């Protein structure tokens, strides 16, 4: 409650904190911690969540260097605010990774529904929808790169657009680009 009162009084535009704030539960990597869980649900300001400072295995450069920044969300297209934040965090000459993962399980559920409509050729629909779902975020990333360059941003944009299991693909993208 004290933390929420302070945040409400100050009304910051942006918050940077770490997982398991005011908690000893940081040893268990599967939650954000009770304070942070409440904070991100009740405030409107965006929150950058960093690893707990006592956590082992965090690469040393992760807390000192932002030469490689990855924007991750469910659907990247239209997320201008997220892209802008990520671009601002990327060091001059650094790399901004823009990531869109189309969830395979959701896609297959829709294809299954389409397959039950006799008037629609399922194979054609599956192929066309799949291509379009990957094309849209790819075009969006291209437009982001163009706008960033037009505005003088000194960074490289790397596009990650794929489909699969979201968590696995996000882990893979992060692991390959550390």
Language-model-detected regions and their locations in the chain:
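Small/aliphatic-rich secondary-structure junction motif
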Residues: 1, 65-127, 149-156
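Short, glycine/charged-enriched secondary-structure capping and boundary segments
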Residues: 29-33, 62-64, 84-85, 111-113, ...
């Amino acid at each position: 409650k004290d933390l929420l009162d302070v945040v409400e009084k100050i009304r910051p535009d942006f918050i940077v904190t770490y997982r398991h704030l005011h908690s000893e539960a940081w040893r268990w990597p599967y939650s954000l911690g009770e304070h942070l869980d409440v904070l991100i649900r009740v405030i409107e300001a965006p929150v950058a969540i960093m690893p707990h400072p006592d956590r082992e295995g965090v690469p040393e450069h992760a807390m000192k260097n932002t030469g490689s920044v990855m924007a991750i969300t469910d659907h990247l297209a239209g997320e201008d605010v997220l892209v802008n934040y990520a671009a601002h965090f990327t060091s001059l000459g650094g790399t901004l990774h823009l990531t869109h993962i189309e969830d395979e399980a959701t896609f297959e559920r829709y294809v299954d529904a389409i397959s039950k409509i006799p008037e629609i050729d399922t194979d054609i629909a599956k192929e066309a929808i799949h291509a379009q779902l990957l094309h849209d975020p790819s075009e969006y990333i291209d437009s982001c790169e163009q706008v960033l360059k037009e505005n003088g941003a000194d960074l490289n944009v790397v596009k990650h657009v794929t489909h699969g299991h979201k968590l696995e693909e996000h882990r893979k993208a992060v692991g390959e680009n550390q």
